[in-house]
Amino acid sequence: MEKFQGYLEFDGARQQSFLYPLFFREYIYVLAYDHGLNRLNRNRSIFLENTDYDKKYSSLIVKRLILRMYEQNRLIIPTKDLNQNSFLGHTSLFYYQMISVLFAVIVEIPFSLRLGSSFQGKQLKKSYNLQSIHSILPFLEDKLAHFNYVLDVLIPYPIHLEILVQILRYWVKDASSLHFFRFCLYEYCNCKNFYIKKKSILNPRFFLFLYNSHVCEYESIFFFLRKRSSHLRSPSYEVLFERIFFYGKIQHFFKVFVNNFPAILGLLKDPFIHYVRYHGRCILATKDTPLLMNKWKYFFVNLWQCYFSVWFQSQKVNINQLSKDNLEFLGYLSSLRLNPLVVRSQMLENSFLIDNVRIKLDSKIPISSIIGSLAKDKFCNVLGHPISKATWTDSSDFDILNRFVRICKNISHYYSGSSKKKNLYRIKYILRLCCVKTLARKXKSTVCAFLKRLGSGLLEEFLTGEDQVLSLIFPRSYYASKRLYRVRIWYLDILYLNDLVNHE
């Protein structure tokens, strides 16, 4: 984002807080397209095959697109003529997609500027380790052991495009950008619904920005009520409140909330809760009674339906009791387990046995869902029996082995925090045998004959790499005793969900 701001220093549109003129700057397209393409390539899934990421940037295409935007009537194409109307070999949907990439980059500028201004004068240290997904899990491992209920909420999507436009009004000041955004959004969705496949990947950066702005609006009200009712003040909440007319709107909302829902207001008085949002869901952990958890549940339902005009069913909010139910969280199944401990204490000639019960959070691997994901990608059948990967037989032996090793190491890396490694070994076994069957099929041989010819050294690649790193971290005696395989290890370099989790 600093690179974009450097180019905008000499642009008068930035100083006047107008974003609309930036749509007609050719250098913005160069920066936005390069930034978006690099982001897509960096997040490419190891399971995706033949994905269309090879669209070339062309200055001629951008110039033609800018000329079309000067005459917006030329951008409006009837639905029946979507496939026929094209120039330079591209349909109109391609140009709406380019505009959406540009819009996502441009509108992120006021977000970043206000975010930077809110942190000025505050000594907040950046911790890059907190960006890791695994940094959340040990935090919950320490906190959830003292709680008994978790509210699992599926965050709803807005059912109408106009809701997204209204949310952006608090961030974008000029009306021209909002009108242009509304026009392109409706035209883009009309093109998409007409002839685009459901599973095609279309500008995830743009829709991720829209989704985050939608969720940010919901969390602002929730955190505001939480902050008003709590005696503990957190400076990190202030980032969410620097918007136009926000305090006036919230003050009115708070008065209506107090007058119409006096009973529920007592619910918000100083509750001890933890809130985490992840992958389209959020969890609210607290140590309350079932009655209070049901009040929290209907509070979320009323908040979404009454104040955000989003149809939200109560079935989308699940109340989980950690001692009995499993919580699906970031690809793990978490639950509380009681570990009885017997401590012998001796005082003079008398000895006592003291029974202590320690609550521990179990993080298990959801083996059934992962096997389902592996079966969907043709690594095994629905029962978990390995099969050959027929679509990879055209590659070289080195490429096939390298792809399987990379998948296996990524899974081991992600699920290293599991409390029971038996399911992890089963997943490794499926991938190893699938690799052998794929190589044997490519060489037109049987599995037994293939292993006899190459020996057991073929599978050593699956065992090296991560095990070598762990042997350097832990003492040799500890590593040799095999106790390492029963220890949960959290890594602080995991920034994305595992691909098998995304397939759920």
From Swiss-Prot:
It is found in: Plastid, Chloroplast. Keywords: Chloroplast, mRNA processing, Plastid, RNA-binding, tRNA processing. Coiled coil: none annotated. This is Maturase K. GO terms for molecular function: RNA binding. It comes from Arabidopsis lyrata subsp. petraea (Northern rock-cress). GO terms for cellular component: chloroplast. GO terms for biological process: mRNA processing; RNA splicing; tRNA processing. It holds the Pfam family MatK_N. Belongs to the intron maturase 2 family. MatK subfamily. Usually encoded in the trnK tRNA gene intron. Probably assists in splicing its own and other chloroplast group II introns. The lineage of its organism: Eukaryota, Viridiplantae, Streptophyta, Embryophyta, Tracheophyta. InterPro entries: Domain_X, Maturase_MatK, Maturase_MatK_N.
